[in-house]
Structure formats: structure tokens, C-alpha cells
């Protein structure tokens, strides 16, 4: 036993060392794992903070946008912005302005919007070319796409009434009143604009809505030049339809809603360029009617000036 004592002591020491080494290894593993976990947590935390910051920034931008639109809308409603027309056009049907041939102005009009796939594209083209137009909107579309209706107005265009459902069939007085009055109301609530311009769907003059509009002092706006773009004609034909009847004081009918308007969008830049090459300027329907209203006075004024006796020249 005496001879085995040093061996046992050595064995005990080795076992202790092995045990201590194992303990240290386990401790290091735990420490390393803990540090790795902390690093992962820290990395994840940074990413989460970045995502949260981006979300908050986006939310602030959206809130700012809403506040700006709301502020503008409230101001518009408070001031009672309106698309008034001269009194002699109220309750009457207008298809063009009676202007002399040298007064080369024309009004582009768009029906059946706002429409998600096309109205914004039409607005982009008009904005690029610095043109103001008139949009005859459908009430239920204004309700479904209020941001597009607001953009029509904030881009400086005239917004007008094209009934709530775009129905063609005959309507009793109550239904006709609903179609027109509710559309005027949703336009006002959405954009702050009170409109006194109306266009009947399909140009139907006998289904009851025009009678209601006239009796309530709306100017019933028809057209003098029809693109027939609702038939999805080839672009050259569509353009030819417009220019076949185009003339000073004319009102051009096109569509930004109610279906596939890709041909209209494709044709619009060429239509604009062609009118400009012919010396035309673009105006809204209210501007066009104002010109007709004022033109006789201007003619009379200029005629009076020209008829004034000239003072004889001093010798």
C-alpha cells in the first residue's frame, strides 16, 4: 500500500485537474454562448429599432399628408369654392362657346372617373403640359377613390357632376334628384368644391336627370367634338374624331374612367401637341363660358372706342 500511495495521490490530482478543466470548458462555453446570444439580441434589437423608426417616419409622412389635405379641404369648404358659371348659362344646355374664329381656345373634358388605372395617368400628362381641364365625375367613384378626386382639384382642374351611378334608363323625379344631388354632395364633402356643372351619362337628355339639373340651375355641359374613345378605337382614329369637329370655343369629350382607357392615355400627348401646333390654348369649361359671356362686351367696347371722333391734328 505504501508503494501505491504516490500513484493514488497522482491519480487524484489528475482527476481533479480533469474535472477543473471540464468545469472551465463548460464555463467558457456558457460564457461564449451568452455573449453570442447577447450579440444576436443586440443586432436584432438594432434592426427592430431601425424598422420601428422607418415605420414611424412613414406614419408621420402619411399623417402630414392627411393633415394637409384635411386643412385644404376645410379651407375650401369654409371659403365655399365653387365652379360657378355666368348666370345666362345656368339651367341651360351648352355644347360649345360662341367665339370668333380667331379666338382659338378649346376645353378638354374627361368623363366617368375617378378611375384607379387611368385618372392619375391623365392628370400626369396634363400636369406635364401645364393644361387645366374639366372632369365630370361619377359619385360612387368619388366615394371609392377620394384621393383621386382630391388630386383633380389640387392640380387645378375643374370637377363637375356626372350622376351617382351613371345610369341611362329613365328615372322618376326622386331618383333623378338622388343621382344629381348626392353626387354634388360627395364632391363637396371630398374636395370642398361646390359644382354647378352637370353632364348627363351618354348625353341622354330624356331620362329625367337633365330636367332635374336644369330646374336646379346647373349648366348642362354637352360637347362639340366626340373622341368616341369609349369604343377603344385605334389611336389615329380617336385623334381624327376629335379634330374632325374641333373649332374655337369647342368642348372635347374623352374618358378617364369606366373601363380600359389606355388608348386615350396614349393619344392624349399627341392630341395636345396637334392642338398647340394649330395655335390653340386650353381652358376649363367655366373659363370658356366666361369668355363667351365677356366677349360681346369686349367687342362693343372696342367698337365704341374705334367710333370715337378723332381730334384734328394741329397744323
Q: Which residues does each predicted region cover?
A:
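Short, structured coil/loop segments at alpha-helix boundaries
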Residues: 116, 142-146, 206, 274, ...
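Gly/Ser/Thr-rich helix-start
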Residues: 23, 114, 140, 162, ...
Amino acid at each position: 500500500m505504501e508503494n501505491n500511495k504516490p500513484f493514488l495521490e497522482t491519480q487524484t490530482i489528475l482527476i481533479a485537474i480533469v474535472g477543473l478543466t471540464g468545469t472551465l470548458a463548460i464555463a467558457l462555453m456558457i460564457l461564449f454562448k451568452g455573449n453570442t446570444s447577447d450579440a444576436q439580441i443586440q443586432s436584432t434589437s438594432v434592426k427592430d429599432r431601425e424598422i420601428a423608426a422607418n415605420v414611424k417616419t412613414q406614419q408621420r409622412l402619411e399623417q402630414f399628408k392627411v393633415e394637409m389635405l384635411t386643412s385644404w379641404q376645410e379651407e375650401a369648404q369654409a371659403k365655399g369654392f365653387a365652379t360657378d358659371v355666368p348666370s345666362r348659362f345656368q339651367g341651360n344646355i351648352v355644347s360649345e362657346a360662341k367665339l370668333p374664329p380667331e379666338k382659338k381656345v378649346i376645353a378638354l373634358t374627361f368623363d366617368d372617373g375617378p378611375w384607379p388605372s387611368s385618372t392619375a395617368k391623365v392628370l400626369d400628362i396634363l400636369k406635364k403640359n401645364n393644361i387645366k381641364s374639366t372632369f365630370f365625375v361619377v359619385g360612387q367613384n368619388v366615394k371609392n377613390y377620394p384621393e383621386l378626386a382630391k388630386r383633380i382639384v389640387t392640380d387645378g382642374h375643374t370637377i363637375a357632376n356626372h350622376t351617382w351611378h351613371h345610369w341611362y334608363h329613365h328615372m322618376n323625379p326622386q331618383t333623378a334628384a338622388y343621382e344629381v344631388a348626392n353626387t354634388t354632395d360627395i364632391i363637396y364633402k371630398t374636395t370642398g368644391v361646390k359644382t354647378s356643372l352637370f353632364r348627363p351619362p351618354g348625353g341622354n337628355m330624356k331620362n329625367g336627370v337633365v330636367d332635374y339639373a336644369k330646374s336646379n340651375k346647373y349648366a348642362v355641359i354637352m360637347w362639340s367634338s366626340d373622341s368616341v374613345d369609349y369604343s377603344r378605337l385605334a389611336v389615329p382614329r380617336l385623334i381624327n374624331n376629335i379634330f374632325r369637329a374641333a373649332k374655337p370655343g369647342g368642348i372635347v369629350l374623352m374618358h378617364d374612367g369606366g373601363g380600359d382607357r389606355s388608348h386615350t392615355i396614349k393619344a392624349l400627348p399627341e392630341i395636345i401637341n396637334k392642338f398647340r401646333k394649330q395655335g390653340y390654348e386650353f381652358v376649363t369649361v367655366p373659363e370658356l363660358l366666361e369668355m363667351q359671356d365677356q366677349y360681346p362686351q369686349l367687342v362693343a367696347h372696342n367698337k365704341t372706342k374705334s367710333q370715337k371722333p378723332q381730334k384734328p391734328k394741329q397744323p
